[in-house]
Swiss-Prot record:
Record function comment: Minus end-directed microtubule-dependent motor required for bipolar spindle formation. May contribute to movement of early endocytic vesicles. Regulates cilium formation and structure.
Location(s) in or outside the cell: Nucleus; Cytoplasm, Cytoskeleton, Microtubule organizing center, Centrosome; Cytoplasm, Cytoskeleton, Spindle; Early endosome
Protein name: Kinesin-like protein KIFC1
Taxonomic source organism: Mus musculus
Biased composition (Polar residues): 75-84
Tissue expression: Highly expressed in 14 dpc embryos, spleen and NIH3T3 cells. Also expressed in testis, brain, lung, kidney and cultured astrocytes. Very low levels in skeletal muscle and heart.
Residues in Kinesin motor domain copies: 311-664
Keyword annotations of the record: ATP-binding, Cell cycle, Cell division, Coiled coil, Cytoplasm, Cytoskeleton, Endosome, Microtubule, Mitosis, Motor protein, Nucleotide-binding, Nucleus, Phosphoprotein
Chain residues that bind ATP: 411-418
Amino acid sequence: MDVQAQRPPLLEVKRNVELKAALVKSSSRVPLSASRLKRGPDQMEDALEPAKKRTRVMGAVTKVDTSRPRGPLLSTVSQTQGHTAAQKGPKKTGPRGCSAIGTVLRSQKPVPAAPAQKPGTSTAPVVVGKRAGKRPAWDLKGQLCDLNEELKRYREKTQTLELENRGLREQLREVQEQATTLGTERNTLEGELASVRSRAEQDQQRLETLSARVLELEECLGTRERLLQELQGERLQLQEERSTLSTQLEEQERRFQATEAALSSSQEEVVCLRQKTEAQVTLLAEQGDRLYGLEMERRRLHNQLQELKGNIRVFCRVRPVLEGESTPSPGFLVFPPGPAGPSDPPTGLSLSRSDDRRSTLTGAPAPTVRHDFSFDRVFPPGSKQEEVFEEIAMLVQSALDGYPVCIFAYGQTGSGKTFTMEGGPRGDPQLEGLIPRAMRHLFSVAQEMSGQGWTYSFVASYVEIYNETVRDLLATGPRKGQGGECEIRRASPGSEELTVTNARYVPVSCEKEVEALLHLAHQNRAVAHTAQNKRSSRSHSVFQLQISGEHAARGLQCGAPLNLVDLAGSERLDPGLHLGPGERDRLRETQAINSSLSTLGLVIMALSNKESHVPYRNSKLTYLLQNSLGGSAKMLMFVNISPLEENVSESLNSLRFASKVNQCVIGTAQANKK
């Protein structure tokens, strides 16, 4: 196709406009009319102004972007408008965008190409309407009107072309966006393709590696099979040889070979057993270290728990009503539920008392006064011995861990102190007291700790302090009942450990030995008949158990005393009664008991107040127990009271003393380790 035929109609329009402008600007040879001759230069310029405007419009029309590829344009206004409406429809984009470009290109209707022109010739402008004919050269006004009409038509056509141009630009922008999207997709797909190719190469390499490994294993398997066949053949050959050997020499050689094989196998077994033994020893050492660490952590947490509970704790126990005793009135003793509700063990009790003095003065019934007390734990009359021991089992464990421990039983005579510490009649395991139960617990735990490398030894002693005199309750033979020679001394100069001279220190290792010692001490203890109790303990009994532990593998040692003290019962004597020889003895005993108990209270208060001087020496009891009462010890006091209303005064005194002790704090306990 000729180049001239491919020119767009817009260039042809531009060329026709330029020709028209030249025609307007050219001077005509027709004489001007009078009206035209009368016009001045300004009026001529106004007359020619439409031509100038038409020239500027044509110049603006010619400023079309020719940098992009030219496609076929629509030839008519209706085609352009239809094409513009088509562009406003929904755009459909295919998977790769190629179909969208094809749709845009197909939507453009081709314009019939102009006939080919020869060089140097111009194409006549497209005339939409018909003119009457060519005006004469002198009819400039008519020519001007024609040109204005033609300019109007060209303006309309220019607007149409501008609309078409905007539509084409919009199409171009959409195509460019689609091309950008397709380029991005292409880059993404190329990256995915590269990744897939990389993985394929890696899989191929792995496949090659695995194939090589398979070949290697197949080769190894073939070698093993050949070796197995060779060995089987050799075995058959040896069997044939053995069956064919008949001489004594060959028989001896066979036996020699068998002996060598057995020896080699035995040596291999020995080596294997040695390795296993070494591994077991290593594992045992590791487990021992771990077990030791866990044991130390248990001791630390156990001691921390005991410190949180308090290094001085007070438990209250109310004995049950015995046969022949009057039942107390309802509401005399009330046990409120624990802090967590009815299921929680009680920690307080309320005691009601009527004021007889006020009743005597006024003559009216005395009102009831209620006294409330709170302790770490309260045991009602129905509490069992096992339940009581469960509360102090952790404290007994602290003694095994190296902390000095002292447990008191305090209260008036007949309140159940001895029953709490030693228990009831022999032979009934349900009535065993704290001492036999504590010993059973210590022996059991020591046996378990032996598997961790700990070795424990226990040495027991049992003394009583009667009228400030120390007596050995384990004395036998001629020394039985003669405790005046016992004195409290230092074990060695400069040592903090105390010992009782002339007292028996018996090593114990089982429950039967402890039971025999308790039976002997029970027979030797000083008792007397009082108004409150037919067999009242008139002395303080102190059961001391010195615990020594050693871990030879780690070079550790620990030791601490466990003191279980049954304090003497207090009982007031009527000062108006005539004192016979027996009553004078009871008075001296009561004075000594009250003095030692008062000193015990002063010592505890001094320790709580961090006083520089603690009056340990004011009493034999506190002097003997001073290493178990200080800041490095743990102490527990049982206050035993009677449930009878006739003993309400003594019960109140005991509860008030116990409340003072419960408010004391003696500091942080420390283990005795070396």
